[in-house]
């Protein structure tokens, strides 16, 4: 999916992963409703199976287009439908978002072993492919980051371009060219 710079509706994917959907369930829903009164947003949100009905009813009651799903459903399809993602920073999730060229706001799980989720997100941030919002600053920073993206898409499109460049640099064909060049130099 390639949103145009003039597109009115933005589709936001929210993914908490196996260990972290609760922070998003509790702390994002009111913000999404608030922003949806100013900007057209569709939310696709992963949550625990027990929370699907409540979350769906909340968004529907507040006139927010939504698709709510549990962890075991088709994740790739949800990514393809989205313009941007708020996610934990597990390596496989970030790799999937990267390959599908979806900029993301990474919220690393602070209890991850050796802080590996922060390191995963930092890799992409250094390449200008994502935003990082640490969990202890989530409530105070997420609104500003989301509004900056929704109201001025220039930084969003820069991140999409950076993801595309990163993905090209990491394609097998390009890696093979580098290997052949090295072999031929020797």
PLM feature spans:
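Conserved donor-nucleotide binding/catalytic region of nucleotide-linked donor-dependent transferases
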Residues: 131, 136-170, 185
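Short glycine/serine-rich donor-binding loops of glycosyltransferases
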Residues: 75, 93-97, 101-102, 106, ...
């Amino acid at each position: 999916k390639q949103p145009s710079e003039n597109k009115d509706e933005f589709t936001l994917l929210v993914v908490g992963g196996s260990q972290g959907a609760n922070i998003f369930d509790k702390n994002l829903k009111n913000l999404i409703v608030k922003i949806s009164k100013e900007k057209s947003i569709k939310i696709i949100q992963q949550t625990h199976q027990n929370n699907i009905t409540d979350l769906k009813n909340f968004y529907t009651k507040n006139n927010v287009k939504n698709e709510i799903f549990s962890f075991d459903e088709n994740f790739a399809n949800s990514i393809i439908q989205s313009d941007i993602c708020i996610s934990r920073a597990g390596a496989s999730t970030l790799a999937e978002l990267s390959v599908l060229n979806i900029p993301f706001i990474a919220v690393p799980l602070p209890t991850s072993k050796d802080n590996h989720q922060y390191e995963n997100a930092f890799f992409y941030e250094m390449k200008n492919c994502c935003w990082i919002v640490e969990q202890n600053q989530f409530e105070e920073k997420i609104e500003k980051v989301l509004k900056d993206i929704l109201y001025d898409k220039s930084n969003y499109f820069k991140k999409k371009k950076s993801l595309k460049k990163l993905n090209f640099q990491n394609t097998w064909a390009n890696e093979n060219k580098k290997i052949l060049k090295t072999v031929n130099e020797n």
